[in-house]
Amino acid sequence: MRMDLDRAAEYDPREIPDEPYDAAVLIPVIERDGEHYLLFTKRADHLGEHPGQMSFPGGGREPEDASIRETALREANEEIALEADEAEVIGQLDDIRTITEYAVTPFVARVPDRSYVPDEREVAEIAVLSLSGILDPDNYEYERREHPHYGDVVIHYFRVDGYTVWGATGRIVVDLLELTTDWRAPERIDRDLA
């Protein structure tokens, strides 16, 4: 299966200007045998925030980052050894607000189909998951939860090849799929939280 990446290139993203912390992620899209794949990282178990969870390469904005896009590219280089000139940034998705007070800016990028090297300090492993696996209805579920500070929220789960993508990363995947494919989440609450 394939995404219509032109939709991401033409999209005018909504930005969240008022969060205390800025962060960015790179959504690496790989083309292999005519199908699209997404590259995820599994966070190292010793990390203080979100240990063992699946994520896209990314992190907090540093003072030396000239832009939030540069943050995404720097973090991808640090976490998976992707050189900035290897990434063809196609577009930007809506910012999402996390319960840890970050405004996360996702960037969609075509990247080469090659082996990537995880930074063992932050990344336990790299997983390249097929779009067809992500879109398989048997691999998706959601639940509504009551959050003590934010009220009713919907949590999206994508379970593919033994990996579970959920939380903020799950929200970003939902946004990407709804923009670039005909897939729609069965239920959604837009509270900008993940």
Describe the residue ranges of each PLM region.
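N-terminal leader/linker segments that precede catalytic domains of diphosphate-processing enzymes
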Residues: 1-55, 60-115, 123, 151-194
